[in-house]
Amino acid sequence: MLLDAIEARIIGCLLEKEVTTPDQYPLSLNALTLACNQKSSRAPVMDLSETQVQAGIDELTKKRLVSEQSGFGSRVVKYKHRFCNTEFSDLQLSSAQVAVLSLLLLRGPQTPGELRTRAGRQHDFKDIAEVEATLTALASRETPLVVQLPREPGKRESRFSLTIVEATTGMTTHSVASQVDERDDSRIAALEERVAQLEARLDALLLQTH
């Protein structure tokens, strides 16, 4: 399982909102797009369109990490994660582990101190030791989910990064934008091919009528 930057943002948002706004979860495409583009608690800040978020959802659905849920009597399709703690997932995690993974998905590499400070709405860590124990558990799995990065000069704590996200270090807005552009190009090419096919079929039908 390897996620690109957009897929990581989507999963992170779904994990976060499931805990912080359970009455609004699962999320509609519009709500999920707003969550992805939040100015606070996100690094880098993204400016994704609903089309781009939908493309990410489609990829995650193929990976069986997201599923649709239609509301009772509602036409709006909503989405929920199948990343962990579901009957479909092999990952069964504690609330502390989910909070840490969500923060790393949404903000990239962080120190234990940063994780404790930012996790308040998802899990109330009593001290740094609890955060470190959580990180150790995630790093010690048969397939590790996090890895400790070398300590940077002048820093007291090492940062921890996810092993399931592409280019977890040095992720920039530019690289995300490039990834988005590539997705747009592929979708446009597919649409152009579809239009050409429909035009050919229409021409064939017109010939048959004459």
Swiss-Prot record:
Gene3D superfamilies attached to this UniProt entry: Winged helix-like DNA-binding domain superfamily/Winged helix DNA-binding domain
Domain of life, per lineage: Bacteria
InterPro entries: DUF480, WH-like_DNA-bd_sf, WH_DNA-bd_sf
Pfam families xrefs: DUF480
Protein family membership: Belongs to the UPF0502 family.
UniProt name for this protein: UPF0502 protein Sama_1967
Organism name: Shewanella amazonensis (strain ATCC BAA-1098 / SB2B)
